[in-house]
A protein has these predicted regions:
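ATP-binding glycine-rich loop module of kinase domains
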Residues: 220-257
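Catalytic-loop of the protein kinase fold
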Residues: 332, 336-352
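Activation segment signature within eukaryotic-like protein kinase domains
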Residues: 324-325
Length: 447
């Protein structure tokens, strides 16, 4: 984090990223002294409500963060910033997004946790848009012009006032990661599906919390000891939910999906929800995962936008690739059969052991749907594209693709999943069958 005093003294000349959070109420004019170098401007955590009309003087600016401020409208001047690709106004009081506030090169727009009740039709002009974060607003519908954003891959519309998912949305050629829980049309399904797969609450007096194992946007995971009457203590993990809206959606929907998902070899077992208690955070008690499991990749970066970032030394064998692919397809098919869309099918949500055995985690973007509805096949095929992206990444980190017939077949399955004609993609029942054939043929060849 930088200081305004450093900026005024000229100590920051030549920097490419500026982070200022000092309760600012006006835009410091000294920022323009950085015009020839500044590419990332982070003014989050201030009290700003406007930006200067000459903001385009920052002619190299690519990324602008103004979250946790006092804006009630997205400043129109942003639309005149020729190089701006990423714009973030999370957690303001924004009620209006003017059509002329959309930069021509926009790839990533974050308006989570505001008061928007409509999007401008001009959103359809954002032909480079890949990532649109709108959870926690008041949207009642999506403009049909959004269908013109043919590169859109990730959409977060949870916790709004939407009455339905428009059919055109599910036909978008690259849409792969969708979260829509917490809307009137999905709340009913959430309640119905959860009622079909209940887990009794666990007495909190039986659980003692120990050290923190990790934390994310929705909560904190503790190591825990579960002491049931008449049984030996059992080492577990407990996730305590903060209760706040995240960029993906609402924590109560994550809890509901984690419970409704039920048991599966490739899911982290959930013992049950912690019993409600005054003043206590809601929580889930889960199995403690063997430390041999590691996250497969890191989340997308500012530059990669929608694609995960793998360690530079990541190398996968053919056997690992096939096992990961098979495990993931099996668990997603299981979720879809229960009316759950994972919504965040990414390598950074996969825990993998050295043999390739895989656990799918993080239901923060999960949504509920009627698995017998007319829209169900389209939702399943939407997530098939996310699976195709995962296959593409797995194959890219395997050196033996060209020499292994099974991996060549897997590459063909990847192409089918990435088909831009959404109706022509396989669903996960078809994907799992294809993988069974691929693995069986590989075993026969090895024998």
């Amino acid at each position: 984090m930088h200081t305004l005093e450093q900026l005024k003294r000229g100590e920051l000349n030549g920097i490419t990223r500026l982070d200022l959070a000092e309760g600012l109420e006006t835009f410091p004019r000294e920022i323009f002294d950085l015009a020839d170098s500044l590419e990332v401007l982070n003014l989050s955590g201030n009290r700003l409500s406007s930006l200067p009309d000459d903001l385009p003087r920052l002619h190299r600016l690519r990324i602008l963060f103004c979250s946790d401020n006092a804006f009630t409208t997205v400043p129109a001047v942003i639309g005149r910033c020729a190089r701006l690709e990423m714009v973030g106004f999370k957690a303001n009081r924004i009620r209006t997004l003017p059509g002329d506030a959309l930069p021509p090169l926009l790839r990533w727009l974050i308006l989570t946790d505001n008061q928007l009740d409509a999007l401008p039709v001009e959103i359809g002009r954002c032909h480079r848009l890949q990532k649109l974060m709108l959870a926690g607003n008041r949207l009642r519908e999506l403009p049909e012009s959004l269908a013109d954003c043919q590169r859109l891959e990730l959409l977060r519309i949870a916790a709004n006032q939407l009455g339905a998912l428009p059919a055109w949305l599910l036909r978008m050629p690259r849409l792969s990661w969708l979260a829509f829980a917490g809307n009137p049309f999905s709340d009913r399904m959430e309640s119905e599906i959860l009622a079909q797969h209940p887990l009794p609450p666990i007495d909190r007096t039986q659980v003692s919390f120990e050290n923190v194992l990790g934390q994310g946007a929705s909560g904190i995971i503790h190591r825990a000891d579960w002491q049931r009457p008449g049984r030996a203590g059992q080492a577990m993990a407990a996730k305590l939910f903060k209760g706040n809206l995240t960029s993906d959606g609402l924590p109560h929907s994550e809890m509901a999906a984690s419970i409704a998902a039920g048991p599966h070899t490739n899911l982290i077992p959930v013992a049950g929800p912690l019993a409600e208690q005054a003043g206590a955070l809601p929580g889930l008690l889960m199995a403690l995962i063997d430390p041999s499991f590691r996250t497969l990749a890191g989340p997308p970066s500012l530059s990669s936008c929608t694609r995960d970032c793998y360690p530079a030394d990541c190398r996968l064998s053919a056997a690992q690739v096939l096992r990961i692919a098979t495990n993931v397809a099996a668990v997603v098919a299981h979720l879809h059969a229960r009316g759950i869309l994972h919504g965040d099918l990414y390598a950074h949500n996969l825990l993998v052991d050295p043999c390739g055995q895989t656990l799918l985690s993080d239901f923060g973007a999960a949504s509920f749907f009627d698995s017998h509805s007319a829209q169900a096949p389209a939702l399943q095929r939407l997530e098939a594209r996310a699976y195709g992206c995962l296959l593409e990444e797995l194959l890219a980190h395997c050196a033996t693709v060209d020499d292994d017939p099974a991996l060549r077949r897997l590459a063909e399955l990847k192409r089918q999943c990435l088909c831009e004609a959404a109706d022509e993609r396989p669903d996960f029942t078809q994907i799992t069958r294809a993988l069974e054939t691929i693995c069986a043929e590989r075993t026969d060849t090895a024998d």
